[in-house]
């Protein structure tokens, strides 16, 4: 949001602009209206103040009973997990995380899962720009919706397709947009359930893919502050999740060692509280 002029005085117009930004970036409400360090950090770097508290995370670790207890004891109730591949969730894991919700009241905190698609084991790794061809987009879109259906994710579930690569602007236009166009086509052709296409990636990628109409929701890879796609670009208007810092619990030698990425939540999409296989 812009203001009409800068006077050097923190007047009501400036305070309003600051508050609107803080609300948009989902900064803690107690900071609203104050141009403090947390606010400046969010303006100056993509990851912002990494000490800020959130209730969402993503992880490549299987959420066992022990890990679930660790995460919830530390305030994490929303989990990003992979649909397929080496780090995929299982039906048993989904039931472990979401099953207890059925016995909770309306005002009780419920666990949620948001699904991520990133292929592992491909001849070309999915963190290289060469991976993203139109044909791969068709294959990935089909595989993702079929996996989501098999797990029982309902209509309206957002699936976040990862492009974990620092694509330059011309690469977004020439390579990633055709890939995501074909992912969207695969979504539109799937009749069993209607899922919503989202993407994971740097800010510039998220902005362009959503502006093209291929995705409706973004999971922003803001931890990568040095990515060209995060330098000088605003937080996308369609952001749902914002990955901004790592965290870990326990020693790496412990069987229940848990490492996560902290994820801010905009409120436009919260994840899924139940599945119906």
Question: Language-model features: where?
Answer:
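Functionally critical loop-and-helix segments that line ligand-binding/catalytic clefts
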Residues: 52-59, 209-277
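Acidic, Ser/Thr/Pro/Gly-enriched interdomain connector segments
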Residues: 1-8, 48-62
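Aromatic-lined carbohydrate-recognition surfaces of secreted/lumenal glycan-active proteins
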Residues: 190-208, 216
């Amino acid at each position: 949001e812009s203001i009409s002029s800068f006077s050097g005085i923190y007047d009501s117009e400036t305070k309003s602009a600051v508050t609107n930004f803080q609300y948009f970036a989902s900064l803690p409400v107690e900071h609203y209206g104050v141009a403090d360090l947390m606010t400046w950090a969010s303006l100056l770097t993509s990851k912002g103040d990494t000490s800020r508290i959130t209730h969402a995370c993503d992880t490549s670790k299987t959420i066992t009973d022990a890990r679930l207890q660790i995460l919830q004891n530390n305030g994490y109730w929303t989990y990003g997990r992979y649909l397929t591949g080496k780090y995929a969730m299982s039906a048993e894991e989904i039931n472990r995380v979401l099953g207890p919700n059925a016995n909770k009241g309306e005002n009780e905190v419920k666990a949620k899962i948001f699904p991520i698609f990133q292929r592992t084991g491909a001849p070309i790794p999915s963190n290289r720009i060469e991976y993203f061809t139109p044909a791969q987009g068709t294959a990935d879109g089909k595989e993702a919706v079929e996996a989501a259906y098999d797990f029982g994710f309902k209509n309206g579930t957002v699936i976040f397709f990862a492009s974990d690569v620092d694509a330059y602007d011309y690469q977004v236009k020439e390579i990633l947009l055709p890939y995501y166009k074909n992912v969207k086509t695969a979504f539109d052709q799937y009749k069993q359930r209607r899922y919503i296409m989202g993407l994971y990636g740097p800010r510039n990628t998220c902005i362009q893919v959503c502006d093209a109409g291929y995705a409706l929701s973004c999971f922003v890879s803001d931890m990568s502050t040095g990515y060209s796609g995060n330098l000088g670009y605003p937080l996308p208007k369609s952001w749902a999740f914002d990955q901004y810092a790592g965290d870990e619990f326990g020693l790496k030698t412990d069987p229940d060692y848990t490492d996560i990425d902290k994820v801010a939540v905009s409120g436009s999409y919260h994840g899924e509280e139940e599945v119906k296989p």
